[in-house]
Amino acid sequence: MASSLRAAISKIKRDDVGQQVCPNYVMLRSSVTTKVVRNVVEYQIRTGGFFSCLAMLRPLQYAKRERLLGQRNLERISTRDILQTRDLHSLCMPTPDAPMSNHQASTMRELICSYFKVDHADGLKYIPMDERYSPSSLARLFTMGMAGLHITTEPSYKRVPIMHLAADLDCMTLALPYMITLDGDTVVPVAPTLSAEQLLDDGLKGLACMDISYGCEVDANSRPAGDQSMDSSRCINELYCEETAEAICVLKTCLVLNCMQFKLEMDDLAHNAAELDKIQMMIPFSERVFRMASSFATIDAQCFRFCVMMKDKNLKIDMRETTRLWTRSASDDSVATSSLSISLDRGRWVAADASDARLLVFPIRV
């Protein structure tokens, strides 16, 4: 499996509709397999999605410098390859993999400027106001996680040049959206063992249970991609320190929120009896799951910002309610949750507990 994925990196240049794929990005053919064990149907979705396998998290300054100098010594690069908060901006570099509206561009740009404390000129550079682009890396970070969740604990899979979460199915909740079970004639999702709230409560510890690997693209043409990624593969947790804690926490929080939203979509599909009333429908269902995983858009920047600010204020809210807030706010003047009342006053979000306003979030400028 690992060798076939590596071989596919340099061969596949076009997507399913024949459009040219950006050379720095990888389109791997999907492979959806199912396995039934004790009435539990497990889906394994093997795909690279649309993301850069080797250049996902490379610090921009080092990558550009080494490319100009023709540097080939990976050890020298790794000694200086320290992830700084500002380097996380590389996650937001646009790619032509999906369209993005001007509103989405401006909200994502404002989020980056606000959270990483940069001016708007830098924000415009990282996220141009152009509908041809998408905030690909933050958006596709979710796709990357979903593509890697099927990876087993078998050591050979750990080195596949795909960014992945540590998929120990005994402790990794986020793998469970791919698990459903049969209750008579009804298809129901398997209940998670660890909630996303617990993952988010990790504070600035970098969510140590989540292992995101990345590679540094240095010698792209003269060495096989597989060998190169084996040499330069890194784990983001290795880079965790006091200076990088905030950036890594933001990165992983975004991933957790996306995975939770995906699980909600999975639950909706799994409870659709008309579509899944027979076991023969499992294969089309898995194909639909793959399509969702490979094309899922980024969470709304305002919703993400709201969630982060609530976390900073130590306000608790059910994750299912959190991920539904933004879509409902488009039509409702207020959203009542189990613990808070969210009201919308001329675009402002006000979270109130009883009669006290606990959090006020102004809308991101458009």
Curated annotation (Swiss-Prot):
Pfam families with a match to the protein in the record: PolyG_pol
Principal subcellular localisation of the protein: host cell
Disulfide bonds: none
The keyword Mitochondrion appears for this protein: no
Effect annotated for changing residue 260 to T: In strain: Mutant tsE320
A GO term, aspect molecular function: single-stranded RNA binding
InterPro entries tied to this protein: Reovirus_polyG_pol (IPR002507)
Signal peptide residues on this chain, from the entry's feature table: none
Cellular compartment(s): Host cytoplasm
Keyword terms: Host cytoplasm, RNA-binding
The keyword RNA-binding belongs to this UniProt entry's keyword annotation: yes
Region Important for ssRNA-binding and formation of complexes, annotated ranges: 1-11
GO cellular component, as recorded: host cell cytoplasm
Record note on quaternary structure: Homooligomer; in presence of RNA. Interacts with protein mu-NS; this interaction allows the localization of sigma-NS to the viral factories. Interacts with host G3BP1 (via C-terminus); this interaction induces the relocalization of G3BP1 and other SG proteins to the viral factories periphery.
Similarity field: Belongs to the orthoreovirus sigma-NS protein family.
Any further remark recorded for this protein: There is a strain variablity in the inhibition of the host integrated stress response (ISR). There is a correlation with the abilities of the strains to prevent upstream PKR activation and EIF2S1/eIF2-alpha phosphorylation.
Known role: Protein that binds to ssRNA and participates with protein mu-NS in forming the matrix of viral factories, which are large inclusions in the host cytoplasm where replication intermediates are assembled and viral RNA replication takes place. Plays a role in the inhibition of the integrated stress response (ISR) to escape from host cell translational shutoff. Participates in the disruption of stress granules (SG) through its association with host G3BP1 and mu-NS.
Name under which the protein is recorded: Protein sigma-NS
Naturally occurring in which organism (per UniProt): Reovirus type 3 (strain Dearing)
Phylogenetic lineage: Viruses, Riboviria, Orthornavirae, Duplornaviricota, Resentoviricetes
Gene giving rise to this polypeptide: S3
